[in-house]
Amino acid sequence: MPSKAPRKSLSVSFVWTFSILAVLRLTSASFRVIDDCDEVYNYWEPLHYLLYGYGLQTWEYSPEYAIRSWFYIALHAVPGFLARGLGLSRLHVFYFIRGVLACFSAFCETNLILAVARNFNRAVALHLTSVLFVNSGMWSASTSFLPSSFAMNMVTLALSAQLSPPSTKRTVKVVSFITIGAVIGWPFSAALSIPFILLELVDLKGRFRHLFCRWFKAIFVALLITGICITVDSLFYHRIQFVAWNIVKYNVLAKDGRGPDIYGTEPWWYYFANLSLQHNIVLWFAMACGPLVLLAAFTNWINLDSFLDLSSVISPFYIWLFIFIIQPHKEERFMYPIYPVLCLAAAIGLDMSLKLMIQILSSINETVRSKFPVRFVVLCVYAIIGCLSIARILAIQNYNAPMIIYPAISFLETDNNVTTNVCVGKEWYRYPSTFFLPDNSRLKFVKSEFDGILPGEFVESNSTWWNREGYYQIPEHMNEFNNEEPTRYTSLESCDFLIDLEFDHSKATVNEPIYSKSDGWIPVMVYPFIDTKQTPFMGRAFAVPFIEPKWGRYEILVKKPVKIDFSNLRRASKQQA
């Protein structure tokens, strides 16, 4: 274990590392596409309701089910209220909150890097820094307003604390961060603490007094955090609610057509494919880390204590993969909590691979070993990770049309005293949230081929933010079976604007006509959106110079006759460009 670095050099390292990571994460806050409708409807919309008194409501927020935490929403409302106090528009409030998420993620990642440098291995810390700097998976997850992203940051802090020498303080810190991530964020992230608990039992074997005192304090803090969360959520819902337990009940114990599987299932290899896209060869080094650690232990390359320490750090990655691979319902966001563990395992795997390679070369010929270009190989690995990650990030921008189109509605000349309806059909799941609409606009749904349940609307409220009626009133026409609710739809005649996506190969149906070719509507603003059916896989997954994507048209349509000041739209187009 390396000696501790001077406090001054560590503080300088923190400032520089945090600054670079913050800049990189802020690019995510500015440009990342919201690719999960759950993030919008279950988190951004309730946050908008808390801040402004109106927004869309999913069945999960009905007090009958209560599987979403208002405490989690309220925590993110703090920077929202600060941004409002600064006089920012609702769109800028959205990006301000994202910026706070970016900086918090950078803070957590910096703590992990310095913890690895102090207590583990400086070479691994360098590899970890490079992986985090250029990793497209972390770039996306860092600014997601999802409980799994929140849990990811808490796991990062817990992992940082775990790397310090054993003590009561370490145990309390690790348990506290895991509890915060599980109770306020996502309860399943608690499974990542299993290796640490086992390590503690091994370290304190036979010293029951120390074990009792250490864990008594840790459990007390965990219960305190849990009690605070239950209290806050119960105040919002106006009834006793333990949301984390409700989530577990719904996802694990639900029967009779309930549960997550009704929203779709994926094959066992889904996560390997997805992690390969998000982390490229970083995943390979992470997967190799476990076998390399076992090999090192069997060949006496590392002692038993080092083996236990390494195993407790990297095993959560494999445990998490196993747990979620066997679940039929799979989502990209379910992997977020292990992203920092994956990156650390990859850094360790890269370090051990290089050392193993050098050892093999030494056994062959010392001259060959001395000429082996270690630094060049490391730089090549970094370059491959960086190029693939940048290509992935750029490719995702091909889906950013909704983030451009919706704000442009505010440039259309409308009467601010009249509520306008912005309607969406098949594109309901790409809606970026009410933060992107003008103050006097409301999102409405028109019938499409989708036959599941769509969000309803919170009861609009002028009450103080902590006592809005939508928190505790039981809404009508909600169900947990994903059954279609016809009350969600509005007539096309009541729409003022319509958002649609059109491709050259689009075929009209009764419920999904090609609106731009109909008599009643005309597109007034169009933005390119990648055509995933006509673009080869490599062109969709990565920005490849020799593969030109095929494009569709993401459109704002208005009723005929058109009564719009087109100079405003031209100005909007220039600003977005």
Swiss-Prot record:
It is an enzyme of class 2 (transferase). Pathway: Protein modification; protein glycosylation. One of its GO terms (molecular function) is dol-P-Man:Man(8)GlcNAc(2)-PP-Dol alpha-1,2-mannosyltransferase activity. One of its GO terms (cellular component) is endoplasmic reticulum. The keyword Iron does not apply. One of its GO terms (biological process) is dolichol-linked oligosaccharide biosynthetic process. It holds the Pfam family Glyco_transf_22. Its EC number is 2.4.1.259, 2.4.1.261. It is found in: Endoplasmic reticulum membrane. Its main location: endoplasmic reticulum. The chain crosses the membrane at residues 69-89, 96-116, 137-159, 177-197, 218-238, 281-301, 306-326, 334-354, 376-396. It comes from the Eukaryota. It is a multi-pass membrane protein. Residues 90-95, 160-176, 239-280, 327-333, 397-577 are cytoplasmic. Residues 1-29 form the signal peptide. Keywords: Endoplasmic reticulum, Glycosyltransferase, Membrane, Signal, Transferase, Transmembrane, Transmembrane helix. InterPro entries: GPI_mannosylTrfase. Residues 30-68, 117-136, 198-217, 302-305, 355-375 are extracellular. It catalyses: an alpha-D-Man-(1->2)-alpha-D-Man-(1->2)-alpha-D-Man-(1->3)-[alpha-D-Man-(1->3)-alpha-D-Man-(1->6)]-beta-D-Man-(1->4)-beta-D-GlcNAc-(1->4)-alpha-D-GlcNAc-diphospho-di-trans,poly-cis-dolichol + a di-trans,poly-cis-dolichyl beta-D-mannosyl phosphate = an alpha-D-Man-(1->2)-alpha-D-Man-(1->2)-alpha-D-Man-(1->3)-[alpha-D-Man-(1->2)-alpha-D-Man-(1->3)-alpha-D-Man-(1->6)]-beta-D-Man-(1->4)-beta-D-GlcNAc-(1->4)-alpha-D-GlcNAc-diphospho-di-trans,poly-cis-dolichol + a di-trans,poly-cis-dolichyl phosphate + H(+); an alpha-D-Man-(1->2)-alpha-D-Man-(1->2)-alpha-D-Man-(1->3)-[alpha-D-Man-(1->2)-alpha-D-Man-(1->3)-[alpha-D-Man-(1->6)]-alpha-D-Man-(1->6)]-beta-D-Man-(1->4)-beta-D-GlcNAc-(1->4)-alpha-D-GlcNAc-diphospho-di-trans,poly-cis-dolichol + a di-trans,poly-cis-dolichyl beta-D-mannosyl phosphate = an alpha-D-Man-(1->2)-alpha-D-Man-(1->2)-alpha-D-Man-(1->3)-[alpha-D-Man-(1->2)-alpha-D-Man-(1->3)-[alpha-D-Man-(1->2)-alpha-D-Man-(1->6)]-alpha-D-Man-(1->6)]-beta-D-Man-(1->4)-beta-D-GlcNAc-(1->4)-alpha-D-GlcNAc-diphospho-di-trans,poly-cis-dolichol + a di-trans,poly-cis-dolichyl phosphate + H(+). PANTHER family: ALPHA-1,2-MANNOSYLTRANSFERASE ALG9, GLYCOSYLTRANSFERASE. Belongs to the glycosyltransferase 22 family. Catalyzes the transfer of mannose from Dol-P-Man to lipid-linked oligosaccharides. This is Alpha-1,2-mannosyltransferase alg9. It comes from Schizosaccharomyces pombe (strain 972 / ATCC 24843). The gene is alg9.
